[in-house]
UniProtKB/Swiss-Prot annotation:
Loss of function contributes to the increased salt (NaCl) tolerance of cv. Sha. One of its GO terms (molecular function) is sequence-specific DNA binding. It holds the Pfam family DOG1. This is Protein RESPONSE TO ABA AND SALT 1. InterPro entries: Seed_Dev/Stress_Resp_Reg (IPR051886), TGA_domain (IPR025422). One of its GO terms (biological process) is negative regulation of abscisic acid-activated signaling pathway. Negative regulator of salt (NaCl) tolerance probably by enhancing abscisic acid (ABA) sensitivity. Keywords: Abscisic acid signaling pathway, Activator, Stress response, Transcription, Transcription regulation. PROSITE patterns: DOG1.
Length: 230
């Protein structure tokens, strides 16, 4: 996959991924709407949960590969064309904020036990701490590019021209920025995936199906560009 087309290739992947995603969301909606008499078996519920998590993981694995090859196009992944304008209003390091999962859990499940609530509360604190770590590292990368020598060289571009060594310094700074942004993106995506997985581990299969249904619907809302043409 050439550097110049990594984001384009990922956009094509997302189009196919969304087709499969709609199918999974329909399955989750159906499973969560059945009463106890008609509900699918526990094994079928567990299988559906596992399949959906694997499906979501595939998205982030493909994204990781694309970001790793993106080169200059890494910046595209922070305001991606496969997200609609609604999604871009709430982007956090290129996707949804991991702690949003806890809000979605609250609105999806009304029968959490006290033990489950305590575990989720502990996980929420851990997730928010890790979110701060991601943002701290991201800020340090941005700060390194804003250092006076680099900014001076950047201002000379297209103006009076750069003196000896400044062009190399600027190129090196941009490489550091791109690598740092890619690392921040990957760390954020890992936190997104692990947070969903850990929440699901706390829930029963019927509860997990309800939460994943809501998360799946959010994925559609963020990524379905057809909404903008509706």
């Amino acid at each position: 996959m050439p550097n110049t087309s990594s984001s384009q290739s990922f956009t094509i992947f997302v189009d196919g991924w969304l087709i499969r995603h709609r199918y999974f969301v329909e399955q989750l909606m159906c499973a969560s709407s059945l009463d106890e008499t008609n509900r699918i078996s526990l094994e079928e519920q567990q299988s559906l949960v596992a399949q959906f998590l694997s499906h979501c993981l595939q998205y982030y694995q493909e994204k990781f590969a694309s970001v790793s090859l993106a080169g200059d196009n890494v910046f595209t992944f922070f305001c991606p064309p496969w997200f609609n304008s609604y999604a871009k209003l709430i982007l956090w390091v290129g996707d949804f904020k991991p702690s949003l999962v806890f809000k979605l859990t609250e609105v999806s499940v009304a029968d959490l036990t006290r033990h489950q609530k305590d575990r989720i509360s502990s996980l929420k604190s851990e997730t928010r701490r890790k979110e701060r770590e991601v943002m701290r590292d991201f800020a340090l990368v941005q700060q390194s590019v804003a250092d006076p020598p680099v900014m001076l060289a950047a201002r000379r571009v297209g103006a009076v021209g750069m003196v000896d060594g400044e062009e190399t310094d600027l190129e090196e700074a941009m490489e550091v920025l791109k690598a740092g942004m890619a690392a921040a993106m990957n760390n954020a995506d890992q936190l997104r995936c692990s947070t969903v997985g850990k929440v699901v581990e706390i829930l029963t299969p019927p509860q997990a199906i309800k939460v994943l249904r809501t998360i799946g619907q959010l994925h559609l809302r963020l990524r379905d560009r057809d909404q903008e043409r509706a």
